């Protein structure tokens, strides 16, 4: 089986805008986030207390990445220690996202009070034992879903 490398490269254009690039060649960058690489498989984490649709979309994302790369990501109902993690959830109910915001590692203020909006951002060393996290924070359950689906779409999955 041929192993593909899938890389999501986040380049922050400004405080409110970002550009996401999906690439099969892993390049080292401050904003690069390897989902699947030769020795790396990210864990997709959601909060068990978040809306049920967040769990469902996390499961679909894991399936989408497996369809594209042939590699299955791990899925967890809380953030886990590991080299790379994807944390998906709503700003209201995801404890990890709220903690990152309160520690000043992500700015969720543009999402507060908004409908169907999301933020995608990489964070280096967000928690002890985690090297890098890709945060997909939604203003509400639809926002979290749209954010993760947009990553699937960028990886080549048709909605």
Predicted regions: what is each one?
Residues 3-13:
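Sec-dependent N-terminal signal peptides
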Residues 18-159:
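Contiguous, structured surface segment used for ligand recognition
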